[in-house]
Amino acid sequence: MNRQFRAAARVLIRPMIPGLLVILLAAVSACSDDPDNPEQQVRDMISAGEEAVEARSIIGVLDFISDEYQDKDGRQKQEIKQLVAGYILRNKSIHMLTRMQHVALNDDETRADVILYVGMAGVPVASVDQLVFTRADLYRFDLSLVLEDGDWRVARGDWHPARLEDF
């Protein structure tokens, strides 16, 4: 029965987990070479977030999700916390390859919309060509970031499967 429960949980949760991790990776703050350039801050944050997810730092990642987070399915920060913790604990190794397609800041530069493509695998992935051989999961993420107390945080995230050609 325990095996059946775990199998059912994987079927239900697996499609959500990679998306949640990438949403969370986008929330991790980082210093920019040009602290006055919000777009560069967002790009640096994505890079630092990738490192936090690969380091499997649950607390490090979750600290940067907005307390006001809510996605289209009604999930809030607490549900994200549970899903991320479960995914990180079940995976001994997490490796990501990210490609940012688009960053758009609002007029007062306190909100940003990001389109991000992510390949997630259990082994290191250094190039798009390796995504095929590692059987990586490929996703497109549409993220809404908000500037809170000087740090960019994820306020909303939606995702769906991507194709290799998207990278």
Describe the function of each predicted region.
Residues M1-I13:
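N-terminal secretory signal peptides that target proteins for export/translocation
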Residues L12-M16, E148:
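Sensor of tandemly repeated, compositionally biased sequence architecture
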Residues P15-A27:
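Bacterial N-terminal signal peptides
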Residues A30-I58, D63-F64:
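Short, low-complexity N-terminal intrinsically disordered segments enriched in polar/charged residues
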Residues D36, Q40, A55-R56, G74-Q78, ...:
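Soluble non-cytosolic domains of exported or imported proteins
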Residues I46, L83, M96-H102, S127-D129, ...:
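Short structured motifs
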Residues L62-D107, R111-D113, Y117-M120:
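Short solvent-exposed beta->alpha transition segments
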Residues L105-F167:
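Exposed beta-sheet edge and beta->alpha loop/turn motif
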